[in-house]
Amino acid sequence: AVGDDTPQLY
């Protein structure tokens, strides 16, 4: 999710 420390799609 947005703001998480791991790279991921919005």
From Swiss-Prot:
Catalytic activity: 4 hydroquinone + O2 = 4 benzosemiquinone + 2 H2O
EC number from the UniProt entry: 1.10.3.2
Cofactor or coenzyme needed: Cu cation
One Gene Ontology term of the molecular function aspect: hydroquinone:oxygen oxidoreductase activity
Keywords from the named record: Copper, Lignin degradation, Metal-binding, Oxidoreductase, Secreted
Main location: secreted
Record text on cofactor binding: Binds 4 Cu cations per monomer.
Documented activity regulation: Strongly activated by Mg(2+) and Al(3+). At concentrations <50 mM, activated by Ca(2+), Mn(2+), Co(2+) and K(+). Strongly inhibited by Hg(2+) and, in a concentration-dependent manner, by Fe(2+).
pH behavior: Optimum pH is 2.2. Activity declines sharply with decreases or increases in pH and is absent above pH 6.6.
Record flagged with keyword Cell cycle: no
GO biological process: lignin catabolic process
Subcellular location: Secreted
Gene Ontology terms: cellular component: extracellular region
Temperature dependence per UniProt: Optimum temperature is 40 degrees Celsius. Retains 65% activity at 20 degrees Celsius and 24% activity at 100 degrees Celsius.
Other information: Inhibits HIV-1 reverse transcriptase (IC(50)=0.6 uM).
Job of this protein: Lignin degradation and detoxification of lignin-derived products. Has activity towards ABTS and, to a much lesser extent, towards N,N-dimethyl-1,4-phenylenediamine, catechol and 2-methylcatechol.
The family this protein is said to belong to: Belongs to the multicopper oxidase family.
Name listed for the protein in its UniProt record: Laccase
Species whose genome carries this gene: Hericium coralloides
